[in-house]
Structures are given as C-alpha cells and as structure tokens.
Amino acid sequence: MKQCEVLLIGGRAGVGKTTVGWEISAQLRTAKVAHVVLEGDFLGHVHPAPEGDPHRSAIVERNLASIWGNYEELGYRRLIYTHTVSVLPEAAAMFKRIMGTEPRLVRVLLTASDITAHERLAGRELGSELVKESERSAYKARLLDEHAPADTVRVMTDGRSVVQIASEVLATSGWTLPDARQKSVAQTRVVPSP
C-alpha cells in the first residue's frame, strides 16, 4: 500500500486555515493531483461534549477514521487537514492510528498578528462570539508558537493574498512536483473531477 500523506494546516482562529485549504485544493485540482480536504472543526462540532470526551478529541478521531476509511478504500492517499492545533505533536498519533501505516506528516502553522486575526474574525463572527473567539485566538496563537514541533513550517499571512499563502504552503508538501503528479494519477483509482 502506498504511504499516506497528510498536510496539516494549523493556526489561530482568523488566520485563514480553511480558506487556504480550499485554495490548495484548487491548485491541486489544476495540477491533477488526487487529494481529500477535511476541516477538523466540523468533525467535533457537537454540544454538549460527549461524556468522557470534554475536548471532543475522541469524537473527532472516530469521525475522521470513518470518513478517511471511505476515501482510502477509493484509493486516496493525500489529505489536507485544517484544524487549529493539528500541528501539535499529539495530533500525529491520531493519524498513525487511523491510517494504519506511518503517514508522512507535513506541518504548517499559519500565523497572523493579533490585529489581522481580530479584523478577520470581525468579518466572520457576526453573532455573539466575537470577543470570546478573539480572546481564544490570541491564547491559541501563543500556545501554538510555544509548542509546535521544530519541523513545523511557519507561514505568515498578514498582508498576503490567499493564492500566495496557499502556493507557499503547497510547496512544503512536494505534491506538485512532476513525479508526485504522475504517481498520484497512476496510483489512485478514482480521481476527483474538477
């Protein structure tokens, strides 16, 4: 079985993880590279938290295992996974358990200043959560800065276009190199349509 590869895109709220993930997907479709995109926040968005799972990590893992199993059965081996803390060391174990092999993990931490993150959140959080989300975002930025492993690539997002950021992040994966594209198409039974 071909080794699975995961492009982990982490970062504080408002840094652009989801938007960058979708742009990377667009660039990979153009390059005809088979892949899957999953937003980790959606895998654990339940209330209240399941009993015995206050951080919702167990339900995220169960959902990811279920979803990834379907994609893997179809031949997919590359996953773009966006989630705030996905770059932290403890996330690696989840992917190893789910993928059943030693997946190649590429960690990218998107960063933004407090001002930039708050401005982006203000455009997104139109309800009652703006103040809380902004405070949590600042806290997570410091946590990620302190605890991201040494092999994590840090990409600043302030003042840059989504296309520029996504291109830089995608380059870290090596997925668009000529050999990678050929292997992707040849070894995947189902290639997503554009």
Locate the predicted segments by residue.
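Hydrophobic anchor at the beta1->P-loop junction of P-loop NTPases
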Residues: 9
